[in-house]
Amino acid sequence: MSNKMWGGRFASGPDAIMEEINASIGFDYRLAMQDIAGSKAHVAMLADVGIVSADDAADITQGLEAIKAEIESGAFTFSRALEDIHMNVESRLAALIGPAAGRLHTARSRNDQVALDFRLWVRDTIDALDGQLRGLQLALAEKAKLYAGAVMPGFTHMQSAQPVTFGHHLLAYVEMFARDRSRLRDARARLNESPLGAAALAGTSFPIDRHATARALGFDRPTANSLDSVSDRDFVLETLSAAAIAAVHLSRFAEEIVLWSTPQFGFARLSDKFSTGSSIMPQKRNPDAAELVRGKAGRVIGALTGLLVVMKGLPLTYSKDMQEDKEGAFDALHSLSLCLAAMTGMVKDIEPDTERMKAAAGAGYATATDLADWLVKALGLPFREAHHVTGRLVAAASAQDKGLEELALAEMQAVEPRINAGVFAVLGVENSVRSRMSYGGTAPANVSEQAERWLGALAAEPASKI
């Protein structure tokens, strides 16, 4: 038996494997609310311009509301035989209200319908992710304010480089997530055009009002080219690109949490809420939440790569390949949402060991740059010469297994005779961070000010997410 939604020219139904590979209801059921919203706007417009009667439009709208209630309550039965969410909804509508349901699809194709539904879903998801990113920024800024003066090592090449503060380190991620929010908002602004009314690819001969449906659905305007309207998936690619970058930021932070929680670092501790044990080693406390955030970044990046490969060879306009646009996007953006929730919880939960971090900050000659700067400022040495002198002093200290601050003044003067006792003021890690007063630097006063600025800005954001 052929599919009654499209099977008029077919003498028989599809093969079982064709049904299996063709059906998308197993994942596009997630578009149900967007599909119903689009259909309600469409039928209201059809009635306004006189294409369907007011009575039919009212019956269709009432039926769509009933279907929405069934889906929300869990009473709706999704049918694989009906392929996708669009045909599942339309079939149920016909069962509820009869022949009038057949008028809903006037001047519309599944091509513009799915493009609309997916845009609405991505837009809703961006709004939700933006709210989660804001929550993570707040948690980071609050913790940064609390630990604005807690000294820790700053690293380059995973080697101790210069002392920074824990608060400063956390604020670096606040900045990263701000850029992620900006990218998602940019993607949202570009996707906010309605493809509804483009029909299959060429538009329609019916006197529809695309501007009316665009307004009703919260879009800025209708799309301007019907071919592009049904074949465009840039809005998904751009959103996945922004999501992948955000996932990379989360993964980098997760990696640091994993390192910090090792006995070898011992910089921070996650509570039992975000740790697990071993089935064989009773002493273990594994930072599994952070490891899973790190791992899920690969899924988000993979979804972006996968969709790029799907789209790269498609001529205009719609091809069935484009059904593969959704499953990866659903998974990737859900994974990102989980990661944001987990990371926000870990940030609130994490307990830094400030004494251990401070001790580590003083190891590895992390104040060598401060010494070089002092030689420039106090003695007038060119920086390259100061760099060379400092290197010789580090070598002298290292040969004796001492810190720079443990060298005697006479030992320093053996390298550079003009060094005086004032040098010792810059060799402590707390003095080092206090001196970094340049804009964006790690001085605790700077960090406190930046944390307050972020907390104020985030608190002042309007209640609506975008």
From Swiss-Prot:
Keywords of the record: Amino-acid biosynthesis, Arginine biosynthesis, Cytoplasm, Lyase
Domain of life: Bacteria
Name of a matching Pfam family: ASL_C2
Pathway given in the UniProt record: Amino-acid biosynthesis; L-arginine biosynthesis; L-arginine from L-ornithine and carbamoyl phosphate: step 3/3
Gene Ontology MF annotations: argininosuccinate lyase activity
EC number of this enzyme: 4.3.2.1
Family matches, as HAMAP family: Arg_succ_lyase
Name under which the protein is recorded: Argininosuccinate lyase
Organism: Methylocella silvestris (strain DSM 15510 / CIP 108128 / LMG 27833 / NCIMB 13906 / BL2)
Lineage: Bacteria, Pseudomonadati, Pseudomonadota, Alphaproteobacteria, Hyphomicrobiales
